[in-house]
């Protein structure tokens, strides 16, 4: 099957094809989506300053610990500013004629706001007073259950091996899969939030990739209302992350806290779930494995870095005879700092690795999967070289002020 755009060696042809996207297929409201995303960014950007002052007054401040990278007390609760941007942008989307039917015929956006409010409440309490792991986990399950109760759940699953194909999930399987993936992504984003700008940047990259994939679904299905929720959810999240990044990039003036990282995880889970639910094998064909697996690959992109870090940490600590959950300064970002990368470069390198997987999966709906895989392979080589360069040039007197 041919997708709407073909990869070509002619750069001008590819650019022209991408520009033609807005004219192909009914109901692809690119301008409205861009406006909604920009609104989320602006509200978040201007709300972050007041939230920073509020966090300082309430005592929601992260004081440096031995294993932390930051060296000065820094306010958190930045997730509140992001949530305000998201709520404002979703309200605007509900008033725009081109996006209104996404609210009338789907509960995706209202579900995200309600579940987001739950996770925001849990996160804010944790940012200020701290919560034990069990209480926090219960809050995450509650927020994920809100999504399921309001109709945001995985209904089909494509398995490309063994001739299985598309599986229609029963209610119990649908609930369990949705809860498991949602809580996993929420915790993955919470786990990776260890460097200035890292979680916000990963949220931005992955949300843009999901939005790109959702726009492709809208184009291919003539503006089917089922594909509005993932497009709106992802572009709103991308805008909120973009608006927060100027305050959070190294050296950060404010941290997003658990309220922010868990909110990003919840919305990414909701966006990928609403993107995956309506996809039909009849629409794309069994051989288009990349397109059918893209929602899962986008989930993998979010979880790739934190899960790799977590697995390495468990192996490292158990081999040393310590608890698998005992803290240390040997996380992936610590190692990248130690080999000679600056704080900013570590963040940018992780952006690159996640972006390769995220945009590689999302672009499968526009480009030939074989060409996409070839480009991804080349990008992986480039990312690998960029990661290892300090080992080749580093001397005993190597120094970078950003490491301080």
Swiss-Prot record:
Site (described: Could be required for catalysis): 193, 196
CDD domains: GT_WecA_like
Molecular function GO labels: glycosyltransferase activity; magnesium ion binding; manganese ion binding; phosphotransferase activity, for other substituted phosphate groups
Pfam family, one: Glycos_transf_4
Reactions this protein catalyses: trans,octa-cis-decaprenyl phosphate + UDP-N-acetyl-alpha-D-glucosamine = N-acetyl-alpha-D-glucosaminyl-1-diphospho-trans,octa-cis-decaprenol + UMP
Its EC number(s): 2.7.8.35
Gene Ontology terms: cellular component: plasma membrane
Key words, A-Z: Cell membrane, Cell wall biogenesis/degradation, Glycosyltransferase, Magnesium, Manganese, Membrane, Transferase, Transmembrane, Transmembrane helix
Transmembrane segments: 33-53, 79-99, 105-125, 148-168, 175-195, 198-218, 225-245, 259-279, 295-315, 347-367, 372-392
Membrane topology: Multi-pass membrane protein
GO biological process: capsule polysaccharide biosynthetic process; cell wall macromolecule biosynthetic process; cell wall organization; lipopolysaccharide biosynthetic process
Miscellaneous information on this protein: Mycobacteria use decaprenyl phosphate (C50-P) as a lipid carrier in all known cell wall biosynthetic pathways, rather than the usual undecaprenyl phosphate (C55-P) usually used in Gram-negative bacteria.
Family, similarity comment: Belongs to the glycosyltransferase 4 family. WecA subfamily.
Role played: Involved in the biosynthesis of the disaccharide D-N-acetylglucosamine-L-rhamnose which plays an important role in the mycobacterial cell wall as a linker connecting arabinogalactan and peptidoglycan via a phosphodiester linkage. Catalyzes the transfer of the N-acetylglucosamine-1-phosphate (GlcNAc-1P) moiety from UDP-GlcNAc onto the carrier lipid decaprenyl phosphate (C50-P), yielding GlcNAc-pyrophosphoryl-decaprenyl (GlcNAc-PP-C50).
Protein name: Decaprenyl-phosphate N-acetylglucosaminephosphotransferase
Organism: Mycobacterium tuberculosis (strain ATCC 25618 / H37Rv)
Primary gene name: wecA
């Amino acid at each position: 099957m041919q997708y709407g755009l073909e990869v070509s060696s002619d750069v001008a042809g590819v650019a022209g094809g991408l520009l033609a996207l807005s004219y192909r297929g009914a109901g692809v409201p690119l301008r409205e989506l861009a406006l909604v995303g920009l609104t989320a960014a602006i509200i978040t950007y201007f709300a972050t300053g007041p939230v920073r002052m509020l966090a300082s007054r309430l005592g929601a401040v992260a004081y440096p610990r031995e294993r932390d990278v930051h060296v000065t007390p820094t306010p958190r609760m930045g997730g509140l500013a992001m949530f305000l941007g998201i709520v404002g942008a979703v309200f605007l989307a509900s008033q725009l004629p081109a996006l209104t039917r996404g609210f009338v015929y789907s509960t995706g956006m209202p579900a995200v706001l309600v579940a987001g409010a739950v996770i925001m409440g849990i996160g804010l309490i944790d940012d200020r007073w701290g919560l034990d792991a069990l209480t926090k986990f219960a809050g995450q399950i509650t927020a994920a259950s809100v999504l399921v109760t309001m109709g945001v759940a995985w209904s089909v699953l494509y398995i490309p091996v063994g001739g299985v194909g598309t599986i229609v999930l029963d209610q119990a399987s649908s609930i369990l899969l949705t809860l498991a993936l949602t809580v996993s992504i929420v915790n993955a984003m919470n786990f990776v939030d260890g460097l200035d700008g890292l979680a916000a940047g990963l949220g931005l990259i992955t949300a843009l990739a999901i939005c790109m994939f959702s726009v492709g679904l809208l184009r291919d299905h003539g503006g089917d209302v089922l594909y509005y929720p993932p497009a709106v959810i992802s572009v709103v999240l991308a805008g909120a992350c973009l608006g927060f990044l100027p305050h959070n990039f190294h050296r950060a003036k404010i941290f997003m806290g658990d309220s922010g990282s868990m909110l990003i995880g919840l919305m990414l889970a909701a966006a990928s779930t609403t993107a995956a639910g309506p996809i039909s094998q009849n629409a794309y064909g069994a051989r288009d494995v990349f397109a059918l697996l893209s929602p899962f690959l986008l989930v993998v992109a979010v979880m790739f870095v934190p899960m790799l870090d977590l697995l390495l940490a468990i192996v490292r600590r158990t081999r040393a005879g310590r608890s698998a959950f005992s803290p240390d300064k040997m996380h992936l970002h610590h190692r990248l700092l130690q080999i000679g990368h600056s704080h900013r470069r570590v963040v940018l390198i992780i952006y690159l690795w996640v972006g390769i997987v995220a945009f590689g999966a999302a672009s499968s709906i526009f480009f030939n999967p074989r060409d996409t895989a070839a480009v991804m392979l080349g990008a992986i080589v480039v990312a690998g070289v960029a990661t290892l360069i300090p080992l080749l040039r580093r001397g005993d007197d190597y120094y970078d002020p950003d490491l301080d």
